[in-house]
From Swiss-Prot:
NCBIfam families: small_GTP. This is Ribosome-releasing factor 2, mitochondrial. This protein may be expected to contain an N-terminal transit peptide but none has been predicted. InterPro entries: EFG2, EFG_II, EFG_III, EFG_III/V, EFG_V, EFG_V-like, EFTu-like_2, G_TR_CS.
Length: 860
């Protein structure tokens, strides 16, 4: 570590080749190179779609604000603490200082365009991250240099890894006490299971008080020292550059660190890239002589292949290190032309039962059909050999107070143009696309078109498009869609089951309509929010992903939307199920002489619905949301109905498929109304439709008649069973897989607390690194890679000792017992313990715990 003044003091805009060009405010290079009006016309090869992902409070929004400022998109830097950031624009976000909704924004940089999505870091909003990752080509993972790799970082990293998304790591908060760049790099290798190349490393200066101060970075690729002006009024644009090769005699320690970092980089890249080996041999086997262009190309190839992760460092809050990170986005992350082809299938709705007859509506199978895909080197993805076919995925819907419903989408092929016709392949409905927008946080910009590889917004769709819908268009050409095009399905977005409930009710009857309207808006925006109604209590039950999730929902209802409502505390989401099979049939009928009727029976199962034997039966329909199954037995459909179809005597206004769907929907409604003992929705339950009748030659009855009788039949069966055999029903509770990360000296006390207070079942206790498949590789890799000294960790001679001293406890825990666990864990571990949870499934509540839960809800 060297105390030095700058050799060259220049105010410049950092570029990947370190050209020295003016970067003073008012002479914005990005604006000069790429005007705002031309931003939307940037070709796909100069476009990047990135997400900012991390654990909460790692600095995602702070980093994004600097990117906006340095690109010339904003005139001042927003501050999370002051609540004036561009991407956190919801009142709840600004009040709490956290990101709740992912926000999209587009910036220019080095004649390129970067579409950025800033995602939440709190575990309750993981679904926001999940649906954002579906439309991203790459991501920047931000890590807190003090905390290292945290639980949520590990979780979202694995999500991105499963999708094959290339990543860059940015070690933030290097200015903080206790910041450990090298320790964090070791954790990246160990916990995230990735090779790394250090593209820059921290630079420290030691003033007279002998406390190291983070001042800049050593650029390993270009062999330069970049030092930022740290005056209180500096905004990060005043940077001095020192050429370490020219000044190696004056700065031998810095030069040696860069040399060792380069050597490690070349060794890592050379394991998979022969061009590096060739260049090394051509340059006298001197690591420092390998050209920057050769290294850049190799790093990009390795990043795109998920072979390596480029690592950068900085302090976004202190305006240090962000510009090199932005260059890395352009240099190392893929354009839409370089990313992998998305998962696309052609898929139409499936008929509920096999039927014959010329009059029935024809439906294709639900089995995915291969779709011809190719990548045009200039325009990008081409689907079904049709370069004029536009496809887009709707990944987010919001309701703006003045602009109405706004649907965020990613265009995958073709060009989406305003004033043309689009089709929603889920509904088959055609819509007139009037206006297209690009979003700048909360501010829209109207554009005439949005081309492949870009993210935009459609306004004015109301309820016609929801999250996960695929949109197709032929652009200005008004031609019909063929069967394959009209049933395309892109990148299905899985919605996790809600785990917490909270009840809400209007203060007066006059407040009901407005409250219901507000709830519908929230449901449209957030597919992870579920709503049901307790008819006995007259309460609306909101179900969400966590306590904070529901608290934010309630805040939005009452504070933002001005709904007059009474709110209850957040509680765990329980379910009911049959404790044992019940083969007793129940018949329900209506109309003259029972001409509309149904016969059903009920059963139950353990585990996931799709894995049960019931799911393999003919006519089985799996209801994934509540893990239920409805079986419409093939023999249940009356023969006279099929005869009426064959002989063209079908007089009903409804097709046979519509009638069958009504039967199923009636069953679904009844199951959601709740069980007879606890009043919770039924789960892991089978409804078997054994027989049903409907007068096909009558105009007096419709599909609603069938929906009503199936609902009443299931409701009656549940009620009768509850009155005659209360013990037949069991209470189910959510069980979580919990991972607790601690130091070994806290192991005994934490295990005791988990098993006694949390009622946990311990499944394993290991060294933290032993949970990784490639333990030996991770240890060897972290030992092999050069990392610079951590000046804030002088007493740690062997970082491996610290890593190996950490334990991970894996346990299955009832969710109810984990409420408030974090504060207890921190108390036990002196603030060093952390944990994360993932949903395993629903399990029957054991008798020893049933009484306390029953008392909580005033049962029995």
């Amino acid at each position: 570590m060297t105390n030095t003044g700058p050799i060259v003091r220049r105010v410049f805009r950092y570029a990947s080749v370190l050209d020295t060009i003016c970067y003073k405010r008012g002479i914005h290079s990005s604006r000069a190179l790429l005007s705002e009006s031309r931003l939307n016309s940037v070709p796909p090869d100069r476009t990047r779609n990135i997400g900012i992902i991390a654990h909460i409070d790692a600095g995602k929004t702070t980093t994004t604000e600097r990117m906006l400022f340095y690109s010339g998109k904003t005139r001042r830097i927003g501050n999370v603490d002051e609540g004036d950031t561009v991407t956190d624009y919801l009142p709840s976000e600004r009040e709490r200082g956290i990101t709740i909704q992912s926000a999209a924004i587009t910036i220019p940089w080095n004649k390129n365009k970067i579409n950025i999505i800033d995602t939440p870091g709190h575990a309750d909003f993981t679904f926001e991250v999940t649906r954002s990752l579906r439309v991203l080509d790459s991501c920047v993972t931000i890590l807190d240099a003090v905390a290292g790799v945290e639980a949520q970082t590990e979780k979202v990293w694995k999500q991105a890894q499963a999708l094959g998304i290339p990543k860059i790591a940015y070690v933030n908060k290097m200015d903080r006490d206790g910041a450990g760049f090298s320790r964090t790099v070791k954790e990246i290798i160990q916990k995230l299971q990735t090779r790394v190349v250090l593209c820059n490393i921290p630079y420290w200066e030691t003033p007279v008080n002998d406390v190291p101060i983070f001042k800049g970075v050593l650029d390993v690729l270009n062999k330069k020292l970049l030092k930022w002006n740290s005056d209180s009024n500096a905004n990060g644009t005043d940077i001095s550059v020192t050429d370490l090769e020219k000044e190696m005699d004056k700065y031998p320690e810095l030069y040696e660190m860069v040399s060792k970092s380069r050597e490690s980089m070349v060794e890592t890249l050379g394991e998979f890239d022969e061009t590096i080996i060739d260049s090394f041999l051509e340059n006298d086997e001197d690591y420092m002589k390998i050209p920057v262009a050769v290294l850049n190309s190799a790093i990009k190839r390795g990043t795109l292949a998920n072979y390596v992760t480029p690592v950068f460092c900085g302090s976004s809050f202190r305006n240090i290190g962000v510009q090199p990170l932005m260059d890395a986005v352009v240099n190392f992350l893929p354009s839409p032309l370089e990313t992998k082809v998305p998962d696309i299938s052609s898929n139409a709705p499936k008929a509920l039962a096999k039927m014959k007859g010329k009059n029935r509506k024809k439906k294709v199978t639900s089995e995915p059909t291969d779709v011809p895909l190719s990548m045009d080197p200039k325009h990008g993805l081409v689907i079904n050999k049709n370069p004029n076919l536009t496809t887009a995925l709707a990944f987010k819907v919001i309701t703006h107070p003045t602009r109405g419903v706004m649907t965020f989408f990613r265009v995958y092929s073709g060009k989406l143009t305003s004033n043309t016709t689009i089709m929603n392949t889920r509904t088959g409905k055609k819509l007139n696309l009037r206006k297209l927008l690009l979003m700048h946080g909360d501010e829209p910009e109207v554009v005439p078109s949005i081309s492949a590889g870009n993210i935009g917004v459609i306004s004015g769709t109301d309820d016609d498009i929801v999250t996960g819908d695929t949109i197709v268009s032929h652009g200005p050409v008004n031609k019909p869609f063929n069967d394959l095009e009209s049933s395309l399905k892109m990148l299905p977005i899985e919605i996790p089951p809600p785990l917490f409930n909270s009840s809400i009710e209007p203060l007066t009857a006059g407040d009901t309509r407005h409250l219901n309207s507000c709830i519908q808006i929230l449901l449209r925006e957030d597919p992870s929010l579920k709503v049901s109604v307790d008819e006995d209590l007259g309460q609306i039950i909101l179900s969400g992903m966590g306590e904070l999730h529901l608290e934010i929902i309630k805040e939005r209802l009452v504070t933002d939307m001005k709904a007059n409502a009474r709110l209850r505390d957040v509680a765990v989401s329980y379910k009911e199920t049959l404790g044992k099979p019940n083969y007793k049939s129940v018949t329900q009928s209506t109309g003259d002489n029972g001409c509309v009727s149904i016969e059903i029976s009920m059963d139950s199962f353990e585990g996931l619905a799709e894995e049960s034997s019931f799911a393999d039966e003919d006519g089985a329909i799996v209801l994934e949301h509540e893990n239920n199954i409805v079986i419409l037995e093939p023999s249940a459909t009356p023969e006279y109905m099929q005869t009426a179809i064959d002989e063209r005597r079908w007089k009903s206004d409804h097709s046979l498929e519509d009638l069958q769907e009504s039967l199923v929907h009636g069953c679904i409604t009844a199951l959601q109304l709740g069980g007879p003992v606890f009043g919770f929705a039924l789960h892991s339950t089978v409804i078997r439709i054994k027989n049903w009748h409907f007068p096909v030659d009558s105009k007096d009855y419709n599909s609603s008649s069938l929906l009503d009788i199936s609902r009443r039949a299931v409701t009656k069966n549940i009620k009768d069973l509850g009155e005659s055999e209360k013990d037949l029903f069991s209470l189910l509770e959510p069980i979580m897989q919990t991972k607790v990360y601690i130091n070994s000296d806290s192991l005994g006390e934490v295990v005791h607390d988990l098993t006694h207070r949390c009622q946990a079942t311990i499944t394993s206790i290991d060294d933290e690194s032993e949970n990784m498949d490639a333990l030996n590789w991770a240890n060897e890799e972290s030992e092999r890679v050069y990392v610079p000294p951590d000046y804030t960790m002088k007493n740690t001679n062997n970082l491996q000792v610290e890593l190996r001293n950490k334990k991970v406890i894996v346990a299955e825990t009832p969710l109810r017992e984990m409420i408030g666990y974090l504060s207890r864990l921190r108390s036990i571990t002196q603030g060093r313990g952390v944990f994360d949870m993932s949903y395993l499934g629903m399990k029957r509540v054991i008798k020893s715990r049933l009484a306390s839960i029953s008392n909580e809800f005033n049962f029995m």
